[in-house]
Amino acid sequence: MPGNGPAPAARGLRAAWRHRGPLACALLPLSLLYRALLGLHRLPYALGFRRAGQAGIPVIVVGNVIAGGAGKTPVTLALARHLRDSGWSPGIVSRGYGRSTDDCREATPESAPADVGDEPALLARASGVPVFVARKRIEAVQALRARHSQVDVVISDDGLQHLALARDIELCVFNDDGIGNGWLLPAGPLREPWPRPVTAVLHAGACPPTDAPAFAMQRQLAAEGVNAHGERIPLAALRGRPVEAVAAVARPEGFFSMLASEQDLALEHAQALPDHYNFESFQRLGRNEDPLVCTEKDAVKLWRTHPQAWSVALQLQLPPDFWALLDQRLQALRRPRA
């Protein structure tokens, strides 16, 4: 499976995060400094000098405590669909990481990722619910409710460390790496100490240490791809052909592995590009006539120059016990408003 991957420095650091080896130990003093800075950030809230903004409706925070992708966006999509199907009117707020703008704005299915961020652009296209972005999430919530008065529950995407927005439910998502070596950045992958109190833990690999209810996520790729023209193709139709795959996500190797193992595709080339890559200078490694496959997040940017690329969605399944817990918590929050 020829192709390029993350920079050697990034690969080395991620490898170091799995163990408490020489490199991780050398970085440990910086982790102690990082922990002190975290404490200073939280102190005004702990002492009551700063207060979290109140949304006025239930807020579900989806986040993680590890650096890099953990699968938050598929969880946010699954939540939005479940809530909508359960009679709620959800809305989504996000910071909009990587965008060229800095204001509070709505992300629509037509929004460019450069204007709202990659994840909000995907959420706006795929969720069917209103999405707003702002650096201060409470501003996004206020704008969301002002324009969409029917919204009665908010999902905050990647908001676990954003203390300025009060929350009722916290969901912490873990990928296959779990907590790695258990150390804080940069000696380890943790953005904050773990374990910490949360409503529930959602994990793709082994369950991390926690006292919270924990639920295993089942992830798989969709069985078909879609291009910029809305045409669809079963991935099975690509078997036996040389396929080029590209991914600009936190863990591109996971996407490539699933294409090969789940869909039995022969990846002639696999390009792993930096997360949030803009694709303006993207060049194919293979022949133009060979199928080009990409992640759902990358599709809108790639389609500007390669509309024939096949976007493959990541599908997520969560156990019934998780949905029962979520519904129970939300009903308890809804009763006072009945």
UniProtKB/Swiss-Prot annotation:
Its EC number is 2.7.1.130. Signal peptide: none annotated. One of its GO terms (cellular component) is plasma membrane. It comes from the Bacteria. Pathway: Glycolipid biosynthesis; lipid IV(A) biosynthesis; lipid IV(A) from (3R)-3-hydroxytetradecanoyl-[acyl-carrier-protein] and UDP-N-acetyl-alpha-D-glucosamine: step 6/6. GO terms for molecular function: ATP binding; tetraacyldisaccharide 4'-kinase activity. The keyword Mitochondrion does not apply. Keywords: ATP-binding, Kinase, Lipid A biosynthesis, Lipid biosynthesis, Lipid metabolism, Nucleotide-binding, Transferase. SUPFAM superfamilies: P-loop containing nucleoside triphosphate hydrolases. Transfers the gamma-phosphate of ATP to the 4'-position of a tetraacyldisaccharide 1-phosphate intermediate (termed DS-1-P) to form tetraacyldisaccharide 1,4'-bis-phosphate (lipid IVA). This is Tetraacyldisaccharide 4'-kinase. It comes from Delftia acidovorans (strain DSM 14801 / SPH-1).
